[in-house]
Design a protein with these regions (language model features):
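C-terminal or mid-to-C-terminal helical accessory/interaction module adjacent to the motor/catalytic core
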Residues: 74, 87, 96, 139-234, ...
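Conserved short loop/turn motifs at secondary-structure junctions
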Residues: 2-3, 104-107, 196-198, 287-296, ...
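Intrinsically disordered, low-complexity regulatory segments
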Residues: 1-178, 378, 468, 507
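Short active-site loop/helix that positions an aromatic residue
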Residues: 14-22, 116-117, 209-219, 421
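Basic, low-complexity terminal or inter-domain segments flanking catalytic cores
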Residues: 2-5, 28, 93, 121, ...
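C-terminal helical "lid" subdomain and adjoining coupling/linker elements of P-loop NTPases
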Residues: 191-200, 211-266, 310, 458-460
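Metal- or metallocofactor-binding catalytic centers and their adjacent structured scaffolds
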Residues: 254-296, 304
């Protein structure tokens, strides 16, 4: 009887698969084995794409005449650092007694690519290959994945998309980086007083750099506009009402106004004060009940954004933490774009909740959900939607592995608690508020106030994080509530005072690592063309698995961005701005979110079988040829000096450090 070989993406995951089998496993160098089963692993990528000089030694030198470089057949090679493990895996894959191969690499595009490259270079033939697709590392889920494993051929479209993504990044990186470095590198190096300067370009990386530079320039060009509002304070409750222009007002359609509730000049606001009378009457009062539903569950981008706000940690650090929590069976698969449950999981979601009932911090809420049966209708709610899931459902707690929590760092347990509370909150009712809107008339002018008064905490009772300091929130006083409850249309009121309050417009906020991750995920919304925006509205820049790494590369490797580690605020460096100028003048479309998102849309279409790999490759090749030839034709390196000089005025002595350390207001 032949053996089954299980191949995982990393040793820790392989151990979890091995532990699932009721077998005595012997440990060998690079694998484990029993009478029926062999378990081995990769170290992430074991195989990579070969550099151009492997095709032709002449390509080692960067010369414009060798571009564009688009090979007919791509070459691959085993990473030198992984050669020993690759040889072990190759030997196991081709062992005569191995009949079945279970592919247990990460359940996603990149995990598929990792195995397909190993398979390709190992020359696997005449073996039954099955794909294990799981959503968590719990024993039950691993066993289900093995039981329901499908022929690897069912994932061929995903494999095609994975290969194309790698070819796209490879070809754009090599061709555009070389072309722009040859054209502009010497001029840039001279300007910066450096020996060399490489213009590093990437499909996603360059677009993200452009977004940060664009935002920084918007902030620089922003001119604050002062405006003046008129505030009246009601007696005796101290309720503040703000004047707004209404039909019948002396200032209706007046050019003196800044929007509908302020003035451009202080003297005009003070003139209004002289028109107002302390005695007023209620013009309108409305009292409505408003509900606020629990937010959708976490996907990776949303969790990374919240962790930046809550803990001031980078998206990369967040991903490392939740990957560890996943491998310790505490959370489901982390690299997901979905924010909902699958209907299959929703049917048995009480199992997760029962597990959490043993967690002291949230046992009260979990037990309440179980006792009241609040989980029973979740399958019919907006929190369950199979149509909004591609590879994996949202990140949720498994309810298992709780014993591992005691040995985890506090930051990890805080992130875990964040996911747990978001998960439990969806089973609770909405929070309820009483919304009161008040319009008071004084000498024909209208002053307004609105309030949201909490009436039922609902799901917010679950969101009481143990790691946050309890702060007394300022709310409306009971005296004010009593006054508002007593008022009706026509009721007389009295103002104790009026004042002019100065304000000013504020510039756009700099991106933090967290807000950039969300901006990358929602890149389709940045597109101005309505038709194109509708076509790719669900596409982002990069993927949930790659976004954090791209930001890290821009900061730590290329030094195109600066990161304030305390606030996680991103700002461009002088080099980053110069590269952006260089790209804008040569291959401007690389800075476009619409182009970058449309490439990602194309990859999704390939993975779904809606576009062939050949069609995609043809479009990619045409794009590279056109733009490389465009760079060849433009002799604009010296012209760029005036842009570099202008950029440098914002990076004088000590100025770059100052900009880097700026915190958000």
């Amino acid at each position: 009887m032949g053996k089954s070989l299980f191949i995982a993406e990393k040793p820790s995951v392989a151990r979890q698969f091995a532990d699932c089998f009721s077998e005595t496993m012997k440990k060998y160098d690079g694998y484990q084995e029993s009478e029926r089963i062999v378990v081995t692993w990769c170290f992430g990528h074991l195989v990579t794409m070969s550099y151009p000089e492997v095709y032709d030694e002449e390509l080692k030198r960067w010369r414009m005449e060798t571009l564009p470089f688009i090979p007919d057949d791509f070459k691959y090679e085993v990473l030198q650092s992984a050669k020993k493990q690759f040889d072990i895996v190759k030997g196991l894959l081709n062992r005569p007694d191995v009949e079945k191969i279970y592919v247990c690499t990460d359940s996603g595009r990149e995990g598929e690519y990792i195995y397909r490259l190993v398979r390709q270079e190992a020359g696997v033939k005449d073996k039954k290959e099955l794909r294990v697709w799981i959503n968590s590392q719990t024993d039950d889920e691993i066993k289900r994945g093995i039981r329901e494993a499908k022929p690897i051929s069912e994932y061929d479209n995903l494999s095609d998309a994975a290969y194309l993504r790698a070819k796209e990044d490879y070809l754009m990186g090599i061709n555009f980086s070389r072309a722009l470095t040859i054209r502009h590198g010497r001029t840039m190096a001279g300007f910066l007083s450096e020996k060399h300067c490489t213009v590093s370009v990437g499909r996603v990386m360059t677009c993200v750099l452009g977004m940060v530079v664009k935002r920084e320039r918007e902030i620089r060009q922003f001119v604050k506009t002062p405006f003046y509002r008129v505030i009246g304070t009601l007696d005796p409750s101290k309720i503040e009402c703000e004047w707004k222009v209404c039909e019948g007002s002396k200032y209706f359609n007046s050019p003196l106004l800044y929007k509908e509730n302020g003035f451009k000049k202080e003297e005009d606001a003070r003139e209004l004060l002289s028109l107002l009378s302390p005695d007023g009457k209620v013009k309108e009062i409305s009292k409505k009940t408003e509900k606020k539903n629990p937010p959708l569950l976490y996907n990776l981008a949303e969790l990374q954004s919240d962790c930046t706000k809550l803990f001031h940690i980078s998206p990369d650090e967040t991903l490392n933490i939740i990957q560890d929590l996943y491998e310790k069976k505490l959370l489901t698969y982390p690299r997901t774009d979905a924010r909902v449950l699958s209907s299959a999981v929703a049917k048995v979601i009480d199992q997760n909740i029962r597990g959490l009932s043993k967690l002291p911090a949230v046992s009260e809420y979990a037990n309440h959900i179980l006792e009241k049966g609040l989980f029973r209708n979740i399958e019919k709610s907006k929190y369950t939607d199979d149509k909004k899931i591609t590879d994996h459902y949202a990140i949720i707690p498994t309810g298992q592995g709780l014993s591992a929590l005691s040995s985890l760092p506090k930051r990890s347990t805080d992130v875990y608690e964040t996911v747990v509370r978001r998960f439990l909150s969806i089973f609770y009712p909405p929070a309820e508020y009483k919304k009161i809107t008040l319009d008071v008339e004084s000498n024909g002018e209208t002053l307004s106030a609105s309030f949201k008064i909490p009436s039922e905490k609902g799901y917010l009772s679950v969101m009481d994080y143990s790691f946050q300091k309890k702060e007394e929130k300022e709310g409306i006083s009971q005296e004010s509530i009593d006054l508002l409850n007593s008022l009706k249309k026509g009721s007389p009121v009295r103002f104790s005072s009026f004042k002019v309050k100065e304000g000013e417009t504020t510039p756009p906020k700099r991106y933090t690592t967290g807000s950039m991750i969300l901006a990358m995920e929602n890149a389709g919304n940045l597109i101005e063309d309505e038709e194109l925006r509708e076509q790719i509205k669900s596409q982002g820049i990069g993927t949930s698995a790659t976004r954090a790494e791209i930001l890290k590369k821009l900061v730590e490797k290329n030094h195109y961005l600066s990161l304030n580690k305390k606030t996680q605020v991103l700002t461009p460096t002088l080099l980053g701005e110069m590269v952006t100028d260089c790209v804008a003048a040569s291959i401007g479309s690389l800075l476009s979110p619409s182009l970058t998102a449309s490439w990602e849309k194309g990859l999704s279409m390939v993975s779904e079988g809606e576009l062939s790999a050949d069609e995609y490759m043809k479009k990619l090749s045409d794009f590279i040829v056109k733009n490389v030839n465009g760079v060849k034709e433009k002799q604009n390196s010296l012209e760029m000096l005036r842009f570099y000089k202008f950029d440098s005025t914002f990076y004088g002595k000590g100025k770059e450090k100052k900009e880097e350390d700026k915190e958000e207001d």
